């Protein structure tokens, strides 16, 4: 799915150059940046050898600190040390204060109700705070890779709405980053494990970070990730494990009453250190506020087990919402640093009935998947591994009456793109319409590639041509085509998704384009003939219906026989292949039926005006 320089198949674009691109996991608790180097995806480290950047920004009187340095000031200046800003992205101030009532920050609403945080350097909003994190990651990438970036792929939760995604893009813009794509975090994790290559089936992505829990159920089919269901808890994460352990420490130490913000931060840090130690050890030593003690893994497990069970309840709901059984999942991918906790891995494995995938560092797996996608999008993969998806390689259209194609999106249209066109019914009382999605450059369906079919049902019964069916073709940045058909008066609709490029090689694209040129005149003639067939059918269908209703009352016997004779001539011409003769037959039939049509119109007007006075008219 590389974004290539546009060139016709078989023609070379600009000479290949390695382009610098990275994947960024902009997380609630921690953020990372990764790149593919010498064919191997890896996270990029800072000058102290650290991959993880805490998603924390400290605003001081004369300085702005991001990451580890900002976290060090959290104890002494908590109100100006911004944690978990991702939770505020795209939300109103009222929403934030309702969801997170105990945040230590001073807020002020902007004119449009969005949150502004009061800092010593002035007011900042969540987008600006996120931009500082992105700037730091960008600087790390430039320093490590030795050049400016061509673009970035930034990951977002699958449930992020348009406002949250737009906020993420705005933050990247403030950081002077070119966003190639926003990639769903569960999809990035699946890509990191190579699940997008060759496998088909259902994948569960269990993402337990510091501040949030997300479960995503994905179906992988023909190279396309479809999100079947998402769930989780935006207020449950590894931080809650820390809080429980911190409360246990306070209880064991005999602390009574409220601690200061600085003391509470010290206890929290001690709890975090103990939790990390218990990942590999059975016991952990704690030394905080003049108290020393030991916590065992068994004690820690007893504290957090209710929370882990709560995540599994979310998993159960997501599985139910997706309409599958647990046994249908082929893999369970673990994401987020909190999935290192042994009890979490054990309970998740037992629930899904299989050992979860944990070979890639769960803190890094999303960033690694994003870096693989970024590397593809800037064109660093060998040509054999790419698909030309920056433009539509072949026209996308719909089959119309007569086996013809109406092109909706012409080839070489840049993506993402959305186009819509209106169609109507062919017969009186028609209540359903079959939508046949096709791909190719030829004029007839038989010479093009069939992509998908679906049926729009529930169209209100009307006379032929009265219904308005709007068909929308939308191709996203991944090359995924969504087709929606909607009847405008009733709003009934149906849709389908398809990957136009799947299973289509560059040679096949070239062949289809070449054949469209070779057969251009033949195709034009075939389409013209098909159009005359359809028009003849329309005229004959309309007259047959009209004669059945008004023929005996509005026409004399001789007039009816004359008209039916002309119609039979058209029926015979319709059996031939001379489109000019059919066209002349249609004109002759139209002329012969003009008087009948005029009488029908007069009758309709008289019926409409019956019983009304001149004033009412």
From Swiss-Prot:
CDD domains: ASKHA_NBD_HSP70_HscA. This is Chaperone protein HscA homolog. InterPro entries: ATPase_NBD, Heat_shock_70_CS, HscA_NBD, HSP70_C_sf, HSP70_peptide-bd_sf, Hsp_70_fam, ISC_FeS_clus_asmbl_HscA. Belongs to the heat shock protein 70 family. It comes from Photobacterium profundum (strain SS9). Disulfide bonds: none annotated. Chaperone involved in the maturation of iron-sulfur cluster-containing proteins. Has a low intrinsic ATPase activity which is markedly stimulated by HscB. It comes from the Bacteria. GO terms for biological process: iron-sulfur cluster assembly. One of its GO terms (molecular function) is ATP hydrolysis activity. Keywords: ATP-binding, Chaperone, Nucleotide-binding. Pfam families: HSP70 (PF00012). PROSITE patterns: HSP70_1, HSP70_2.
């Amino acid at each position: 799915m590389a974004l290539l320089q546009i060139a016709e198949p078989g023609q070379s674009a600009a000479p290949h150059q390695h382009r610098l691109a990275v994947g960024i996991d902009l997380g609630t608790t921690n953020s990372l940046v990764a790149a593919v180097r010498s064919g191997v995806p890896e996270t990029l480290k800072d000058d102290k050898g650290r991959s993880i950047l805490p998603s924390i920004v400290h605003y001081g009187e004369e300085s702005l600190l991001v990451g580890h340095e900002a976290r060090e000031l959290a104890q002494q200046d908590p109100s100006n040390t911004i944690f978990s800003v991702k939770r505020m992205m795209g939300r109103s101030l009222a929403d934030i204060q309702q969801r997170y009532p105990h945040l230590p920050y001073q807020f002020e609403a902007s004119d449009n109700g969005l949150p502004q945080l009061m800092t010593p350097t002035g007011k900042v909003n969540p987008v600006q705070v996120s931009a500082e994190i992105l700037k730091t990651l960008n600087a790390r990438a430039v320093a490590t890779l030795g050049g400016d970036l061509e673009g970035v792929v930034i990951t977002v939760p699958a449930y992020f709405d348009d406002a949250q995604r737009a906020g993420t893009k705005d933050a990247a813009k403030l950081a002077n980053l070119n966003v190639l794509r926003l990639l769903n975090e569960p999809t990035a994790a699946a890509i990191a494990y190579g699940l997008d290559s060759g496998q088909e089936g259902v994948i569960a992505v269990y993402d337990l970070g510091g501040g949030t829990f997300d479960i995503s159920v994905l179906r992988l089919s023909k190279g396309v990730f479809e999100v079947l269901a998402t769930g989780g808890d935006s207020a449950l994460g590894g931080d809650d494990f820390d809080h429980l352990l911190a409360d246990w420490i306070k209880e064991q130490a005999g602390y009574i009453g409220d601690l200061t913000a600085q003391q509470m931060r010290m206890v929290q840090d001690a709890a975090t250190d103990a939790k990390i130690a218990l990942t590999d050890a059975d016991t952990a030593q704690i030394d905080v506020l003049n108290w020393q003690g030991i916590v065992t893994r068994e004690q820690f497990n007893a504290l957090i087990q209710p929370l882990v069970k709560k995540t599994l309840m979310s998993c159960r709901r997501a599985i139910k919402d997706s309409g599958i059984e647990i046994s249908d999942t082929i893999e369970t991918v673990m994401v987020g640093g909190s999935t290192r906790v042994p009890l979490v891995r054990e309970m998740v494995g037992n629930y899904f009935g299989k050992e979860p995938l944990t070979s890639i560092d769960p803190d890094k797996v999303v960033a690694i998947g994003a870096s693989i996608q970024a590397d593809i999008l800037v064109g660093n993969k060998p040509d054999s591994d790419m698909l030309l998806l920056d433009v539509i390689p072949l026209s996308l259209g719909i089959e119309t009456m007569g086996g013809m194609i109406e092109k909706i999106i012409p080839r070489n249209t840049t993506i993402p793109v959305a186009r819509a066109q209106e169609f109507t019914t062919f017969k009186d009382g028609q209540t359903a319409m079959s939508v046949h999605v096709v791909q190719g450059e030829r004029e007839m369906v038989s010479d093009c590639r069939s992509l998908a079919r679906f049926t729009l049902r529930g169209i209100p019964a009307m006379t032929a041509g009265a219904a308005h069916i709007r068909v929308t073709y939308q191709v996203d940045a991944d090359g995924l085509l969504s087709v929606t058909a909607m009847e405008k008066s009733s709003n009934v609709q149906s849709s389908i998704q398809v990957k136009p490029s799947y299973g289509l090689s560059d040679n096949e694209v070239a062949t289809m384009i070449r054949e469209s040129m070779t057969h251009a005149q033949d195709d034009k003639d075939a389409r013209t003939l098909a159009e005359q067939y359809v028009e003849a059918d329309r005229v004959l269908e309309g007259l047959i219906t009209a004669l059945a209703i008004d023929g005996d009352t509005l026409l004399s016997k001789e007039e009816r026989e004359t008209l039916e004779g002309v119609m039979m001539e058209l029926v015979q011409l319709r059996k031939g292949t001379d489109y000019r003769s059919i066209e002349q037959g249609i004109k002759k039939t139209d002329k012969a039926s003009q008087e009948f049509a005029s009488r029908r119109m007069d009758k309709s007007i008289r019926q409409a005006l019956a019983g009304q006075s001149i004033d009412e008219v």
